[in-house]
Swiss-Prot record:
Gene, per the UniProt record: CSNK2A3
Record InterPro entries: CK2_alpha, Kinase-like_dom_sf, Prot_kinase_dom, Protein_kinase_ATP_BS, Ser/Thr_kinase_AS
Organism: Homo sapiens
Record-linked CDD domains: STKc_CK2_alpha
Official protein name in the record: Casein kinase II subunit alpha 3
Gene Ontology, cellular component aspect: cytosol; nucleoplasm; nucleus; protein kinase CK2 complex
Amino acid sequence: MSGPVPSRARVYTDVNTHRPREYWDYESHVVEWGNQDDYQLVRKLGRGKYSEVFEAINITNNEKVVVKILKPVKKKKIKREIKILENLRGGPNIITLADIVKDPVSRTPALVFEHVNNTDFKQLYQTLTDYDIRFYMYEILKALDYCHSMGIMHRDVKPHNVMIDHEHRKLRLIDWGLAEFYHPGQEYNVRVASRYFKGPELLVDYQMYDYSLDMWRLGCMLASMIFRKEPFFHGRDNYDQLVRIAKFLGTEDLYGYIDKYNIELDPRFNDILGRHSRKRWERFVHSENQHLVSPEALDFLDKLLRYDHQSRLTAREAMEHPYFYTVVKDQARMGSSSMPGGSTPVSSANVMSGISSVPTPSPLGPLAGSPVIAAANPLGMPVPAATGAQQ
């Protein structure tokens, strides 16, 4: 085979080409470090593959913040996340990076963020109305169109990374640790992000993907919300994940996608893929979710969950879909007064998904007290974990 057919993003293709090198050359970025003594850890909120997350207090102004202490990874990965967060600072519904600090002894870096009052998505999604889902999907699209316009792919859009303060109807897209700058023609790592939200391009090892990867992931989120099926595509491994997708979207379009881009499919698929016809979205509608499903919702979903990344709606096109007409009309009427264009800090009690409300204990010492940053808490006490914390 002559190799895969190249692909370029349909929108914001040359954003980084037209920007100065220092905008996207994160490996050369010089980090400006803040003072770690400004922060006191309060409790542990959760942990992920690359970090541990704590609620903390900024003792200079007594405001709650979230401290993400990074586990040992390549320095360039840390610089990439910092550079992207700095480039996107102030963008609509983008989590605000407030400070960057480092323990002077262990040299472990930590990112300090605004605090968001989040409700565990597994609880929240069960209570959302049809309008709520439209509203929050539109808010996510604001963040995605903005980051795409800035030449950045998030690459890890999923419920765990969407913080929703439902009381104030505020949303933040968090965890930019896997985000990357888009350069046309560049080949990217396909071993990124959570299995249930992986786009077909990742599952068939097509490396010249672009912003449209985020739109597939958004489609998976929408499907899980309107059908109340979480996750929507539930594969046992990466191979089974594509099989689950093919059983619904059909194998004919999958092979059409593979042929179009001259993709060589892993031989392991020969025995497990089979032949499947395309199914109708309506088959997932039942008495418990029918109030969330509408013709425009299914049409919108159908335009996101496409094998061919080139044929998916862009974030801007998605915002113009009839599914959002009522939301757009309401926001226009209100002058977007309740829909902040920037990332205004949100007062909060918890930030990570899956965190139960617990009484906030007294601050337990400076950032150096983290079990990641230093061996022991200065007060000789462990930092308490929030119950049910997860990432």
